[in-house]
């Protein structure tokens, strides 16, 4: 998947919207979802936590099993109730996404089948970003923020 001319399906509160460069957002119905190439599924950044984790080269092969225990002390939830996804960045860093398993199950039940096979990413990581810069998207009642290559969140606007 290339970040150039990326098509994004934004999933919020059981509804999908296709966002394509140069086009108005298109609501997706459960029937007949037809998606262009180079499309990813953007999930709510207030439901998925993104962070960057340094990982020694010898730990990478066991990272899938070790990650929950590496981060356990920094999390409020029981790690057995969470799903951890990771991808290599550079220089021994891993991009990590953490979400409740129950939340994934909710999404899988409510979203049309063609969306389930798309690459999943948080909406904050779909915002443009450059080193040393923050990108903010102001929406009704909240702000989506990206502050690093693999980090971002949705926060209430009153904060």
Identify the role of each PLM range:
Residues 1-159:
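Hydrophobic/aromatic-enriched cytosolic interaction surfaces used to assemble or bind macromolecules
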């Amino acid at each position: 998947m290339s970040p150039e001319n990326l098509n994004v399906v934004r999933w919020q509160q059981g509804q999908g919207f296709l966002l394509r460069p140069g086009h108005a957002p298109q609501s997706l119905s459960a029937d007949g979802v037809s998606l262009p190439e180079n499309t990813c599924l953007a999930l709510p950044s207030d439901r998925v936590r993104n962070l960057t984790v340094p990982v020694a080269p010898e730990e990478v092969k066991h990272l899938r099993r070790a990650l929950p225990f590496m981060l356990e002390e920094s999390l409020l939830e029981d790690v057995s109730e969470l799903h951890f996804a990771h991808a290599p960045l550079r220089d021994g860093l891993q991009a990590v996404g953490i979400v409740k398993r129950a939340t994934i199950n909710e999404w899988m039940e409510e979203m049309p089948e063609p969306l389930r096979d798309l690459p999943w990413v948080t909406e904050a990581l779909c915002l443009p970003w450059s080193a040393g810069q923050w990108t903010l998207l102001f929406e009704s009642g909240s702000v989506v923020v990206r502050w690093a290559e693999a980090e971002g969140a949705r926060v209430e606007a009153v904060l």
